[in-house]
Amino acid sequence: SALTLRETQHAIKYIKDLFQQTLSFALTLDRVTAPLIVEQGSGINDDLNGVERKVDFTIKEIDNKKAEVVQSLAKWKRMALYRYGYRAGEGIYTDMNAIRRDDDTDNLHSIFVDQWDWEKVITREQRNEEFLKETVKSIVKAIVYTKRKVSLRYPVLANPMNETVTFVTTQELENRYPDKTSKERENLVAKEYGRSEERRVG
């Protein structure tokens, strides 16, 4: 590693602090605290693909009712937007932690999830391709800005990054790489353009 373990921890904190400030400003988001566990049967936990097993256990203080560790905040975020009274143009973000016991692990994936999660209220008129593209560009700008600041603080991590985004559809990828899997197509187009946003996934 280019950094020591201690430097790595400092860098992680710096990146997380800076990126959340930049992203929240770009997308008009408030930080909220998300649950790690929810009551089983509440309908809040997301089933993902419907086959992943949830981590569950009983809680003595609520008559041994079963609780589950969250796998995704997709349903909870929408509920939170409603309960907190957010309006069009406003949203929330959270530093999500979860456990996905059946995930395939690699250098990018772990059974322990630590990721940014966000949701925003939009109008019916904003449900279009142009608004999606502008949102993606705003996120990329936040990432690039963070990367530049990190490079200044940690020159050993410096490498060029620009704000250009190439938009492609799943059908275009299938036409271009007919003999590849969906994951292989994503990797190939990312290598070709540096970064891309795939649309019309399903």
Regions found by a protein language model. Name each.
Residues 22, 135, 176:
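Residues that form generic nucleotide/phosphate-binding pockets
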Residues 106-111, 185-188:
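Short, flexible, solvent-exposed loop/turn segments with mixed acidic/basic and small polar residues
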Residues 111-121, 193-194:
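Glycine-rich, often proline-containing surface loops adjacent to acidic residues and nearby aromatics
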Residues 120-124, 200:
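Short, structured patches in soluble enzyme cores that scaffold and shape functional sites
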Residues 123-125, 129-133:
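Well-ordered alpha/beta subsegment
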Residues 138-200:
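Metal-assisted phosphate- and nucleotidyl-transfer catalytic regions
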